[in-house]
Amino acid sequence: MSQFTLLGFIALGGAFGACSRYLISELCVVLLGRGFPYGTLTVNVIGSLLMGILMSSLNQGLIEAGPWRPIIGLGFLGALTTFSTFSMDNVILMQHGEFIKAGLNILLNVALSITACFIGYQLMMKS
């Protein structure tokens, strides 16, 4: 596959990831409200779980590496998850004096995302 074609597939994966992030975030607002950045937390945890599954699957040889790592890992998951929005969410919370919510958001994003990635990786390990 040419680099140009691969870039096109990565961009397509990114488009699906960005649209997924938007839809998941909007669903979180509808279900949980705007009092906490649930959407960012949700996409980061889901993306981390999927990254663990992807990387374990690749490392175990369950799927052939080929273009899947950059298409899914860089494109889809790169656009689905978001560190910049996570950062801005915390700045906004702190600007509004919501320091406990900001701390909780930081703790939950880091702890749950790493845990989800670990779980995803372990799920795909060969027994």
Swiss-Prot record:
Biological process, per Gene Ontology: cellular detoxification of fluoride
Transmembrane region(s): 4-24, 35-55, 71-91, 99-119
Compartments in which it is found: Cell inner membrane
Broad class of the protein's primary localization: membrane
Keyword Transmembrane: yes
UniProt note on regulation of activity: Na(+) is not transported, but it plays an essential structural role and its presence is essential for fluoride channel function.
Annotated Gene Ontology cellular component terms: plasma membrane
UniProt catalytic activity: fluoride(in) = fluoride(out)
Keywords, in A-Z order: Cell inner membrane, Cell membrane, Ion channel, Ion transport, Membrane, Metal-binding, Sodium, Transmembrane, Transmembrane helix, Transport
Annotated function: Fluoride-specific ion channel. Important for reducing fluoride concentration in the cell, thus reducing its toxicity.
Protein name per UniProt: Fluoride-specific ion channel FluC
